[in-house]
């Protein structure tokens, strides 16, 4: 919500709802911690990559980097996801080349496309973990989001923070964007700052790669040309800022709701002769009707020195 990131007096009308949300969240987490609710403990190490605020903070690029790094050093990771924005007629859903974004959600489809590793979607993450344990030789599980899914025990918690917007007005939903109190950051293993620098936080930078055609054809798009742009992510302006940094001249920029299910009609507002740029996450939802002049901008995550080894050391502690 825009008012989460700028002062508005009427937001305090939502205070009773925020207090109710706080009470429910606290009691729910406490119930799992004290054993009143059952938690599933996997035989494999589980790493949660999540956030304490609503909206896109950069979890998916981090998950992709993490899995690539683990593969490089010899691990066999698998990814689980709730599949937000998708709806399947059965779960657990194993993401494959034939699975579309409207079934699995855009992030799981993107992760599978980039990595080719097992990606399993289930609103109940415990069932996704069990599916991986039964059907794959994975030796570590990465949960894309799920910090607040306390029914699943975890070994490492990593929180991604938006380095520009941070935590908005620092209030709990619905007054603010927080899913949990800021004090929750004190109990996680790593806090990763996407695009900013803060003491005791790991700096993550998203580096833009060469633009790719959405339809999969091989071609090149030079930076500096005039383009239109669209983004259906938590913070579209971040993507538009990235395009500006790549020297693209944006003629028209349109932000859609996060996880928007694209159709052909969404693109009639753009001049067909002008290249259209979108995020890689959005591109996986548009392949069936992509035009030759549609492009996406892949990004890769880079980190401050020493973080990779810190994380590997923490994983080794679990496996000992």
Curated annotation (Swiss-Prot):
This protein's UniProt keywords: ATP-binding, Kinase, Lipid A biosynthesis, Lipid biosynthesis, Lipid metabolism, Nucleotide-binding, Transferase
Short name of any one Pfam family annotated for the protein: LpxK
Pathway recorded for this protein: Glycolipid biosynthesis; lipid IV(A) biosynthesis; lipid IV(A) from (3R)-3-hydroxytetradecanoyl-[acyl-carrier-protein] and UDP-N-acetyl-alpha-D-glucosamine: step 6/6
Regions annotated as coiled coil: none
GO molecular function: ATP binding; tetraacyldisaccharide 4'-kinase activity
Protein's UniProt keywords contain Metal-binding: no
Domain of life: Bacteria
Enzyme class: transferase
EC number(s) on file: 2.7.1.130
Binding residues annotated for ATP, in chain numbering: 53-60
Reaction(s) catalysed (UniProt annotation): a lipid A disaccharide + ATP = a lipid IVA + ADP + H(+)
Any one of the GO BP annotations: lipopolysaccharide core region biosynthetic process
Cellular component per GO, a single term: plasma membrane
InterPro entries: LpxK (IPR003758), P-loop_NTPase (IPR027417)
Family of the protein in this entry: Belongs to the LpxK family.
HAMAP family documented for this protein: LpxK (MF_00409)
UniProt function note: Transfers the gamma-phosphate of ATP to the 4'-position of a tetraacyldisaccharide 1-phosphate intermediate (termed DS-1-P) to form tetraacyldisaccharide 1,4'-bis-phosphate (lipid IVA).
Protein name listed in UniProt: Tetraacyldisaccharide 4'-kinase
């Amino acid at each position: 919500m825009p008012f989460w990131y700028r002062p508005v007096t009427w937001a305090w009308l939502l205070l009773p709802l925020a207090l109710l949300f706080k009470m429910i969240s606290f009691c729910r987490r406490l119930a799992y911690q004290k054993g009143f609710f059952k938690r599933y403990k996997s035989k494999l190490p589980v790493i949660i990559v999540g956030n304490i605020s609503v909206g896109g903070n950069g979890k998916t690029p981090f998950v992709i980097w993490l899995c690539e790094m683990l593969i490089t050093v010899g691990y066999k990771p698998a990814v689980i996801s709730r599949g937000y924005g998708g709806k399947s007629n059965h779960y657990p859903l194993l993401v494959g080349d034939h699975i579309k974004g409207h079934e699995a959600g855009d992030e799981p489809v993107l992760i599978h496309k980039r990595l080719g590793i097992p990606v399993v979607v289930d609103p109940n993450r415990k069932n996704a973990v069990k599916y991986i344990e039964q059907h794959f030789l994975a030796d570590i599980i990465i949960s894309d989001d799920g910090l607040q899914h306390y029914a699943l025990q975890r070994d490492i918690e990593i929180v991604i923070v938006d380095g520009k917007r941070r935590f908005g007005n620092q209030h709990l939903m619905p007054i603010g964007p927080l899913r949990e109190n800021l004090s929750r950051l004190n109990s996680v293993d790593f806090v990763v700052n996407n695009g900013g620098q803060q003491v005791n936080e790991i700096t993550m930078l998203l580096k833009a790669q060469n633009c790719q055609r959405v339809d999969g054809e091989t071609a090149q798009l030079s930076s500096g040309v005039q383009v239109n742009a669209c983004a259906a992510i938590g913070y579209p302006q971040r993507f538009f800022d990235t395009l500006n940094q790549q020297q693209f001249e944006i003629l028209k920029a349109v932000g859609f709701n996060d996880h928007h299910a694209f159709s052909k009609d969404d693109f009639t507002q753009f001049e067909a002769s002008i290249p259209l740029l979108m995020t890689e996450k959005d591109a996986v939802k548009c392949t069936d009707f992509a035009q030759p002049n549609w492009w996406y901008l892949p990004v890769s995550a880079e980190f401050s020195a020493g973080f990779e080894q810190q994380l590997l050391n923490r994983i080794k502690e679990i496996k000992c």
